[in-house]
């Protein structure tokens, strides 16, 4: 963790040292380019598929970070926008309605409709904060899921709890990513092709998130997060700025949802439950709210960690006790929950918080203890 932080810190601390700057980026680019081949060779397609889902979660976490991290609005129903993007892809590229639109047409529509849903959620909740906002957004997420689950009568639109299958894979003209791609000198497996597509989409979303954070809108979000009354007194149109946060976050979720549907080729309401919203929120909080590198790290870690525990829960019991005493799935979630508790106990600002967030936590800790009691460093 510290080595990773130092590596990315070097990228920002030496903007004028071209050799260090470009060498660091070249090494990172080389790692990202070769990672799917290394994972497939060393761990098999199962972990390569997990890596692809990790990139989808990176997109989701960055979208939720706009709402929760930048603007300070607690959204517990964020997964609804993921569902909107996924179902739009499913309806426009499957035998359900006999439509087979291309990706370049579906993704913008999915992003736009998800953004519209974000505005529809944000408009009636503009005066809510904290727990009240969390309850309303949680209800919104469940309404969308139940709506999709029951929209099969009297007209069958979503196929109800059975979901929509036989969804078109992502394709570019006659090239489908569902099949191995023949490059002439080598054959690229389908999962590797999806990895590069998801990586490209994630990099675009990262770039947009960075530009938003550094823009006037990003500074307005930060002002609202710190003190909405003061922000309004400074002339910030808090209504429009908060709506923009909901819309932008939902747009990212819609893009990720569309790519998920094209990758999975099946969607059902069960994929968009409350647990998914909680998981994405955990990625943002544990990684470091408002800090883009921290959110990315949190998304990658919380995607890989449960699967790691899944693979070791049974063998560890077998080696220690000679038999499996506890159901591996239950033990996996117990170990995962314990890891989350430990992180929040010893790293309340997240695993990789922004410097400003770290200072805020330290100030709160100093205010809560007598002056002669030393405060442990973050």
What spans do the regions from the language model cover?
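Transmembrane alpha-helices and adjacent helix-loop boundaries
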Residues: 2-378
């Amino acid at each position: 963790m510290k080595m990773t932080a130092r590596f990315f810190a070097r990228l920002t601390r030496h903007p004028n040292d071209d050799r260090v700057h470009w060498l660091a980026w070249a090494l990172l680019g080389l790692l990202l380019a070769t990672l799917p081949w290394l994972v497939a060779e060393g761990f098999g397609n199962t972990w390569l598929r997990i890596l692809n889902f990790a990139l989808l979660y990176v997109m989701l976490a960055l979208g939720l970070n706009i709402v929760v991290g930048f603007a300070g609005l607690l959204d517990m129903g964020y997964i609804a926008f993921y569902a909107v993007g996924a179902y739009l892809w499913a309806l426009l590229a499957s035998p359900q309605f006999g439509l087979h639109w291309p990706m370049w047409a579906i993704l913008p529509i999915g992003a736009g409709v998800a953004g519209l849903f974000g505005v529809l959620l944000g408009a009636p909740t503009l005066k809510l904060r904290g727990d009240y906002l969390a309850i309303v957004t949680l209800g919104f997420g469940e309404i969308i899921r139940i709506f999709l689950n029951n929209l099969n009568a009297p007209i069958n639109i979503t196929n109800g709890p059975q979901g929509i299958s036989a969804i078109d894979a992502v394709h570019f003209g006659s090239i489908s990513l569902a099949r191995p791609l023949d490059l002439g000198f080598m054959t690229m497996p389908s999962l590797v092709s999806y990895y590069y597509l998801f990586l490209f989409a994630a990099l675009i979303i990262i770039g947009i998130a960075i530009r938003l954070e550094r823009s006037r809108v990003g500074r307005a979000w930060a002002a609202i997060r710190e003190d909405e009354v003061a922000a309004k007194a400074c002339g910030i149109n808090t209504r429009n700025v908060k709506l923009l946060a909901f819309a932008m976050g939902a747009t990212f979720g819609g893009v990720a949802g569309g790519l998920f549907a094209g990758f999975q080729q099946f969607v059902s309401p069960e994929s968009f439950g409350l647990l998914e919203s909680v998981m994405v929120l955990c990625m943002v909080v544990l990684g470091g709210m408002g800090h883009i590198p921290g959110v990315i790290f949190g998304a990658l870690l919380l995607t890989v960690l449960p699967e790691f525990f899944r693979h070791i829960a049974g063998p560890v019991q077998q080696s220690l006790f000679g038999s499996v005493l506890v159901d591996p799935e239950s033990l996996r979630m117990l170990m995962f929950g314990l890891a989350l508790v430990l992180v929040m106990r010893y790293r309340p600002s997240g695993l990789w918080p922004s410097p400003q967030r770290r200072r805020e936590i330290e100030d709160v800790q100093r205010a809560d203890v007598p002056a002669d009691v030393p405060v442990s460093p973050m």
